[in-house]
Amino acid sequence: MRGRPGSVRSLEELGRVRLSASFFMRDFPHSEIAEFHGIPNIPDAPEVAIAAGRKLCELLLEPLQATFGRLAIRSAYRAPAVNEFGNRDGLSCASNLRNYGRHIWDLRDAAGAIGAMATIVVPWFADRYRDGAD
């Protein structure tokens, strides 16, 4: 896939990209900020977002899921416009500059590195924590 998806079909195609055994690209762009405020949460450089997302899934999320069971993705990919809006409005988003190569998967950080991060919930642990374990 080259360039930002420009149609529903191309966005569906992006969502069907398999990042690992358990995860697809469509698992990661959900954003309450984007949905509530009508801001598209679509990568401008899907090929970079896919490469970063694959590493996140293969090196971190798959091993966590193999150990603890199903994971819930709370926040992952953010388009720069979504992240900037969230930062400006105090919605728990760091600045875009701090989120390149983090939540903004398709833009490189100041050192030129790509990366991806996700905020996750481990239901197994959440249940134990609720019941008093830590």
Predicted regions and their residues:
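Extracytoplasmic cell-surface/polysaccharide-interacting catalytic and binding patches
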Residues: M1-P63
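A broad, structure-centric signal for solvent-exposed, well-ordered loop/edge residues
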Residues: R26, P80, D127-Y129
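Short histidine-centered catalytic/ligand-binding loop motif
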Residues: P40-A52, T119-A133
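Charged/polar, solvent-exposed surface patches and flexible loops
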Residues: K55, A66, E84, R88
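Short secondary-structure junctions
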Residues: L64-L71
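Acidic helix-start/capping segments at beta-turn-to-alpha-helix junctions
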Residues: A72-D89
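Acidic, His- and aromatic-enriched active-site or binding-groove loops in soluble protein domains
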Residues: D89-D131
